[in-house]
Amino acid sequence: MRRYFIYLGYNGKNFRGWQIQPNGMTVQQSIEEALAILMRTPVPIVGAGRTDAGVHAHLMIAHFDWEEPIGDLVFLAEKLNRLLPKDIAVYKIVPVVPEAHARFDATSRTYKYYVTTKKDPFNHELVYKLPGRLDFEAMNEACKVLFDYIDFTSFSKLHTDVKTNNCHIQHAGWTQEGDIWVFTIRADRFLRNMVRAIVGTLLEVGRGRLTIDGFRNVIEAKDRCKAGTSVPGHALFLVDVTYPEELFPVED
């Protein structure tokens, strides 16, 4: 059995998230249906994460298995793209070692969230528009607090089936790109709804409704009700997933 990683991106506007579910089309379902047509048999895939409804991915990685070596992976990617809807794109397909796992072997995942205080008719579907001014300097100070903790229960969706709420934050901060402010966060793993809850709470700091110490208290409370409201998913992007080099065989 051979295993392959699919590198892909998608606009999540028209999908009910990544994972297959009964109440609407998902990205995973779209790809599996296209693979089934090409391979003439069901081909399940496993993604690096489970983005929520409306959330996008500049880069998502998923794995699938096939009994024999696939000769022309470039051609397979091209055929997949012909079958997939316009809001999903396969970038490439690469062979990996048989035990490689798109979800469990990922060493980091990076998300970006886009915020603006100015109205723009061209990016309103991909950026979160907020009225008034925000103190991004204070928000960046609050970001530093994230590195002092690993238990992020306060930013986790309630009643999930995860075994632990521990995550190791590797990077977190706000940068400005013209009229848009971008929150970038990288960690070994993320909880369900975690990034949107963190951004929502940081915005409370930016509005002056929550102090830096108050932000720390939210984390220490380990209570989702203490954190801010989750921001909408339409401005959230998964932008990178990393893996150990040993998962990728060296070509002769």
Swiss-Prot record:
Taxonomic placement: Bacteria, Pseudomonadati, Bacteroidota, Bacteroidia, Bacteroidales
Listed Gene3D superfamilies: Pseudouridine synthase I, catalytic domain, C-terminal subdomain, Pseudouridine synthase I, catalytic domain, N-terminal subdomain
Protein name: tRNA pseudouridine synthase A
Active site per the UniProt annotation: 52
Annotated substrate binding sites: 111
Gene: truA
Alphabetized UniProt keyword annotations: Isomerase, tRNA processing
Function per UniProt: Formation of pseudouridine at positions 38, 39 and 40 in the anticodon stem and loop of transfer RNAs.
Catalytic activity: uridine(38/39/40) in tRNA = pseudouridine(38/39/40) in tRNA
Family matches, as NCBIfam families: hisT_truA
Enzyme class (EC, first level): isomerase
GO molecular function: RNA binding; tRNA pseudouridine(38-40) synthase activity
PANTHER family referenced in this protein's UniProt entry, alphabetically: PSEUDOURIDYLATE SYNTHASE, TRNA PSEUDOURIDINE SYNTHASE-LIKE 1
CDD domains registered for this protein in UniProt: PseudoU_synth_EcTruA
The protein's assembly and partners: Homodimer.
GO biological process: tRNA pseudouridine synthesis
Similarity annotation: Belongs to the tRNA pseudouridine synthase TruA family.
Enzyme Commission number(s) from the entry: 5.4.99.12
